[in-house]
């Protein structure tokens, strides 16, 4: 079930088969389910597994048209078929045809696809597949039509995704990028989420300030109404989705200036959240400038936390990387393999000075954050870290 920008976890058993491993559907509506019955690690043997065909009671399969024998316009109409497998098969055939077609055929297919997508009486799945087929078959024609679909409740989120389908695509006109940006204020969380992701993929830096507002939305404790106390992070948290997506979009835009300009202000939370992922001298400079100009103790503590996070970066994965994906990985975080970078020494010196001069509340906060981020200052560990005494050996699968 839909819940805001995401979905609630939901599982509804509909067929009873021992140890099912995979499922597929054909264009006539039949399901094929594979079972790993009696299987062990090696998967072999004469009586291991089976594939079952599942059909509704009294099901009468309908013959599937031979798509290779149909005209291009007939294929477009077949996009209205209720079977997703059939629609996918038809879409692929259409795209193959259009790729090698003459201009007249391309024009007629484009008009037919636009007609299906515009048809409010058609099913949503038919309209969406027509939209996406047009996006792939004729990007220019899609660009002309997309703006009108942004106001369509059924198509808006899909149109936005299609606009941003290829990150940094030069065929997306500035007016269309601006129209997508306007959807950041949509009342629909799903449309808003699509617009947030699109802003990052399209490189729309003008959206940065609005994205920071979304990333700074107040969050409630998901366990506040629970009968028994429970850690917030253990619970589904749909309201975190939009702020998280917005933060990631700001990072994708490398919007350091917008983040610094948001400090202090109502978007401070989102700005600092994004800055923790933006390892650049400009980000560190901006944080130190803000630190020197603000007297807000809470903001100062958050800036120091961000600087401590930025004092290390993620190392490149190599065969010698310590415990990245072994059976006992180091879960201390926030990085798998901490490495210093060009600003590490500068941040460390500033933290050391602050530790020597700060009043007790700030000094305690700095020590806590050094321990939390596993950062050493002045050659000594900030706090004990659980040592990985045993080598993380891979799991041995029986022969």
Residue spans for each PLM region:
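Beta-propeller domains with acidic blade repeats across secreted/periplasmic ectodomains
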Residues: 1-74, 89, 93-96, 100
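Short beta-alpha connecting loops at secondary-structure transitions
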Residues: 7-16, 34-39, 213-235, 239, ...
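Amphipathic alpha-helical scaffolding segments comprising HEAT/armadillo-like alpha-solenoid repeats
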Residues: 69-76, 100-118, 138-150, 169-185, ...
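Conserved, compact domain cores that house catalytic/ligand-binding motifs in diverse enzymes
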Residues: 80-110
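Residue-level detector of extended alpha-helical repeat arrays and alpha-solenoid scaffolds
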Residues: 86-87, 124-127, 156, 192, ...
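Structural signature of alpha-helical solenoid repeat scaffolds
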Residues: 95, 135, 164, 200, ...
């Amino acid at each position: 079930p839909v819940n805001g920008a995401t979905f609630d976890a939901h599982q509804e058993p509909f067929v009873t088969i021992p140890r099912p491993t995979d499922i597929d559907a054909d264009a006539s509506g039949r399901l094929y389910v594979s079972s790993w019955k009696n299987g062990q690690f090696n998967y072999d043997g004469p009586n291991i597994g089976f594939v079952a065909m599942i059909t509704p009671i009294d099901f009468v399969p309908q013959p599937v048209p031979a798509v290779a024998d149909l005209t291009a316009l007939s294929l477009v109409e077949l996009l209205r078929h209720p079977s997703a497998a059939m629609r996918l098969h038809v879409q692929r055939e259409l795209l193959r045809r259009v790729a090698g077609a003459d201009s007249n055929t391309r024009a007629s297919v484009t008009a037919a696809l636009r007609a299906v997508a515009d048809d409010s009486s058609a099913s949503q799945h038919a309209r969406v597949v027509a939209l996406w087929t047009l996006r792939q078959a004729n990007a220019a024609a899609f660009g002309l039509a997309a703006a009108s679909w942004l106001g369509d409740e059924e198509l808006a989120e899909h149109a936005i995704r299609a606009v941003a389908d290829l990150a940094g695509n030069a065929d997306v006109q500035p007016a269309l990028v601006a129209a997508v940006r306007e959807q950041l204020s949509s009342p629909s969380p799903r449309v808003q989420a699509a617009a947030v992701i699109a802003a990052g993929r399209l490189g729309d830096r003008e959206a940065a300030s609005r994205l920071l507002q979304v990333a700074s939305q107040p969050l409630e404790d998901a366990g506040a109404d629970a009968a028994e106390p429970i850690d917030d992070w253990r619970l589904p948290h749909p309201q975190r989705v939009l702020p998280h997506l917005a933060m990631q979009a700001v990072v994708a835009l490398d919007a350091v200036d917008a983040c610094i300009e948001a400090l202090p202000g109502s978007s401070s939370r989102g700005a600092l959240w994004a800055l923790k992922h933006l390892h650049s001298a400009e980000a560190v400079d901006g944080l130190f400038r803000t630190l020197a100009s603000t007297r807000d103790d809470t903001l100062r503590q958050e800036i120091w936390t961000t600087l401590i996070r930025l004092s290390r970066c993620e190392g490149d994965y190599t065969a010698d990387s310590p415990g990245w994906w072994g059976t006992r990985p180091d879960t201390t975080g926030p990085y798998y393999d901490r490495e210093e970078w060009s600003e590490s020494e500068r941040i460390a010196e500033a933290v050391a000075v602050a530790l020597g001069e700060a009043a007790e509340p700030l000094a305690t906060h700095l020590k806590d954050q050094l321990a939390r981020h596993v950062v050493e200052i002045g050659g000594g560990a900030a706090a004990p870290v659980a040592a990985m005494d045993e080598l993380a050996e891979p799991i041995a699968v029986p022969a």
